[in-house]
Every structure is written in C-alpha cells, then in structure tokens.
Amino acid sequence: SDGRDAAVIYTESDVIARGDCKPCMHPDCRFNPGRCRPRE
C-alpha cells in the first residue's frame, strides 16, 4: 500500500456522499459499482 488506497477510499466516500455517481460509471467510484448510486 503506497498511500493511494486511502485517497481512493476518501474520494469514493466523498462522491457517494454527494450522490454524484452516474450509474456506476463515474471515474471516482468505478472500483466499487455496488455502492455507486445514480443521481436523482
């Protein structure tokens, strides 16, 4: 682990919190599509 994992997790959380995922194709959440939520 070179430290990027923490940044990725933070980015994912931030994206999900903003509800900014566009059907699991958002570049910041593509690694965890199961948690990706589309914008309403």
Swiss-Prot record:
Residue ranges the record assigns to the propeptide: 1-18
Pfam families linked: Toxin_8
Keyword vocabulary terms for this entry: Disulfide bond, Ion channel impairing toxin, Neurotoxin, Secreted, Toxin
Annotated InterPro entries: Conotoxin_a-typ (IPR009958)
Major subcellular site: secreted
Organism domain of life: Eukaryota
Presence of keyword Cytoplasm: no
Family: Belongs to the conotoxin A superfamily.
Protein role: Probable neurotoxin with unknown target. Possibly targets ion channels.
Domain notes: The cysteine framework is XIV (C-C-C-C).
Record-given protein name: Conotoxin Bt14.16
Organism: Conus betulinus (Beech cone)
